[in-house]
């Protein structure tokens, strides 16, 4: 059953950011989420994403920012506090690790901890996207939910 069918409104989203170039546009993604009624937004940065942005600048537009493992809040508590995880941008490296259940950083850990299906927004060029390994990883993640 979908959220539309149950009438569930998602108001609390945890955004997982990896180190793709599209990380530089994360403010646009956050603004789009706010425009559709997402009221509480937290961000978990992978180490490479944290190197690409100022966590202080993110704190100005979201409710919480998490960088290090162990994070300042327990991953299980976060999985209860937020209704959905949206990984944007998701690198090919993230997809490969996530497809095998990796938990090397906060973003991967949250993907495993969330009790609800997650949304993953891949970010790579067309040649990388077309690789059979990337497509296998996507298929695994879709199957896993």
Question: Could you say what each language-model-derived stretch is?
Answer:
Residues 1-120, 124-145:
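A cross-family phosphate/adenosyl-ligand binding-site feature
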